[in-house]
């Protein structure tokens, strides 16, 4: 998969590092000014645009603060260990500069549409400034695909599953209610979207932050060791701990950067579409506002999630769970965590290094869910699974022969359950139960997941309809919005795996052209920044 390619994180960080040095660390030098601009201190009357600086920031944040902040951080830590959090920070730090550049250029080349609203984004500077219409079309098509694959379908799918697991609500019922609410919001256009997100984003952030702090302070004695693990393992990889079998530097780096990108979308070119709607005479001023976005999304919210998971100790603890085929492998031989030689071999195997481990191929005799055969070990979520049982359903235990080829049962209807490490939102939920709120902490995750995911769907609908305007004109917007809502409802009870995989490729197809574009316009960007400060100082001397 392109998004998981070894070179992709290096390209992403490399561009951010280049602009950080080239523009002399704007994420540090302009941070205070960004807070002043977003507060409205320098606003002028009759400035062209659809939203205020704060509303544009809130809309962009509603697109970035999503399931990645809850499940994505947990997934990164479960795969890459504590070190993955460090590389998420690096992605955010350099991403603040990348975001500054892409937003400034997108705002600079925005256009007014037939209905009087603004439309901007990387496709406009690719077309109008670089004269690369084919690249602009490619970016816009990828944006439309991503609006479904990352912004809509997996969001409602996660919401529906979470509501069913926590409250017992039927997925279709959840989908129906939220689809109606989604339609009421997005059919009103950017002004209604901005009005809603500017209220929802602060509320959902406050709820989640309070819940996270309740866990972190409850486990205050583990805060120091958690930070120590993050920094000590950053350049060496995460050592084995508890049920966690360890992760190499490459795994920690790759997962941290990828999850960081998925969370704050720096370099992807999506958030600039929202910022292009802002009322601003100077594109650079809106670019400066966008510096706050990765900071809030990743440095604050993702860090809180990471500390909740690490300080509570659940990240390397085994729980009873259903095994996902994508995170499972059956290997030849009987392995235990107590055997140091076997642990070292498992570390190599799980990190793609040369090892003596072979995947299991053969038949496993099962009676009443329990395996009678020996000579194999089940791995799940980078841990040795314990108390493994085979079944057709949760209540129906399997009896018969399970055929396994290359480490995987050939019959998809046979499920495996047992004790292993867990990941994604399930891991975050376990962690939130280890605080002052006890088991009630799971409701904070469910409510957070609901608000985060729903707001992401709202923001991405706007990104998609601006891309449709560029591709097919204003008349395509309403059919797109109707189809977006219909697909949103369908995904509440359907399998969206294929769309998710397609979107993972689409994200890269968005990101690479955008990174190429901003690199080609680096000199123009520097000149724009210099001109902005000359004019700003002159205006404020009056």
Curated annotation (Swiss-Prot):
Q: Name the chain's protein.
A: Na(+)-linked D-alanine glycine permease
Q: Please give the catalytic activity noted in the UniProt record.
A: D-alanine(in) + Na(+)(in) = D-alanine(out) + Na(+)(out); glycine(in) + Na(+)(in) = glycine(out) + Na(+)(out)
Q: Which GO terms describe its molecular function?
A: amino acid:sodium symporter activity
Family in the record: Belongs to the alanine or glycine:cation symporter (AGCS) (TC 2.A.25) family.
Main subcellular location: membrane
Q: What does the protein in this record do?
A: Catalyzes the sodium-dependent uptake of extracellular D-alanine and glycine.
Cellular localization per UniProt: Cell membrane
**Membrane topology type, per the record?**
Multi-pass membrane protein
> InterPro entries recorded for this chain?
Na/Ala_symport (IPR001463)
**What do the Gene Ontology cellular component annotations say?**
plasma membrane
The alphabetical list of record keywords is: Amino-acid transport, Cell membrane, Ion transport, Membrane, Sodium, Sodium transport, Symport, Transmembrane, Transmembrane helix, Transport
């Amino acid at each position: 998969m392109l998004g998981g390619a070894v070179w992709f994180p290096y390209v992403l960080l490399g561009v951010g590092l280049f602009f950080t040095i080239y523009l002399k660390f704007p994420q540090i030098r302009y941070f205070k000014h960004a807070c002043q601009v977003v507060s409205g201190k320098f606003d002028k009357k009759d400035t062209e645009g659809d939203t205020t600086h704060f509303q544009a920031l809130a809309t962009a944040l509603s697109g970035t603060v999503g399931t990645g902040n809850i499940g994505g951080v947990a997934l990164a830590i479960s795969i890459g260990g504590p070190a993955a959090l460090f590389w998420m920070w690096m992605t955010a730090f350099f991403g603040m500069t990348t975001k500054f550049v892409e937003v400034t250029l997108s705002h600079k080349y925005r256009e007014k549409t037939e209905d009087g609203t603004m439309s901007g984004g990387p496709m406009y500077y690719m077309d109008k400034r670089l004269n690369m219409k084919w690249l602009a079309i490619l970016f816009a098509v990828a944006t439309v695909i991503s609006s479904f694959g990352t912004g809509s379908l997996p969001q409602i799918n996660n919401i529906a599953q979470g509501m069913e697991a926590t409250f017992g609500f039927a997925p279709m019922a959840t989908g129906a209610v939220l689809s109606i609410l989604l339609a009421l919001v997005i059919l009103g256009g950017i002004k209604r979207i901005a009005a809603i997100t500017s209220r929802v984003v602060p509320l959902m952030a406050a709820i989640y932050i309070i819940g996270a702090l309740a866990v972190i302070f409850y486990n205050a004695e583990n805060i120091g060791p958690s930070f120590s693990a993050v920094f000590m393992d950053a350049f060496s990889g995460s050592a084995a701990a508890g049920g966690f079998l360890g992760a190499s530097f490459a795994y920690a780096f790759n997962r941290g950067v990828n999850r960081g990108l998925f969370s704050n979308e720096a370099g992807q070119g999506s958030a600039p579409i929202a910022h292009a709607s802002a009322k601003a005479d100077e594109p650079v001023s809106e670019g400066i506002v966008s510096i706050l976005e990765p900071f809030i999304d990743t440095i604050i919210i993702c860090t809180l999630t990471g500390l909740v998971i690490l300080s509570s100790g659940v990240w390397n603890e085994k729980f009873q769970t259903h095994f996902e085929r994508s995170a499972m492998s059956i290997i030849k031989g009987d392995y235990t965590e107590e055997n140091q030689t076997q642990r070292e071999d498992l570390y190599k195997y799980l990190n793609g290094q040369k090892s003596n481990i072979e995947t299991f191929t053969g038949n496993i005799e099962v009676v009443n869910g329990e395996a009678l055969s020996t000579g194999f070990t089940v791995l799940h979520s980078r841990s040795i699974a314990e108390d493994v049982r085979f079944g057709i359903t949760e209540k129906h235990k399997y009896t018969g022969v399970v055929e396994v080829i290359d480490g995987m049962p050939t019959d998809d209807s046979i499920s495996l359950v047992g004790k292993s490490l867990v990941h994604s939102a399930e891991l975050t939920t376990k962690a939130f139960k280890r605080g002052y709120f006890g088991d009630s902490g799971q409701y904070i995750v469910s409510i957070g997941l609901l608000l985060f995911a729903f707001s992401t769907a709202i923001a991405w609908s706007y990104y998609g309809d601006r891309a449709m305007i560029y591709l097919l004109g204003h008349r395509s917007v309403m059919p797109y919005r109707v189809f977006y809502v219909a697909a949103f409802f369908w995904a509440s009870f359907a399998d969206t795996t294929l769309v998710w995989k397609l979107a993972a490729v689409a994200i890269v197809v968005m990101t690479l052209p955008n990174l190429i574009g901003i690199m080609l316009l680096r000199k123009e960007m520097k000149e724009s920044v210099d001109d902005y400060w000359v004019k700003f100082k002159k205006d404020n001397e009056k």
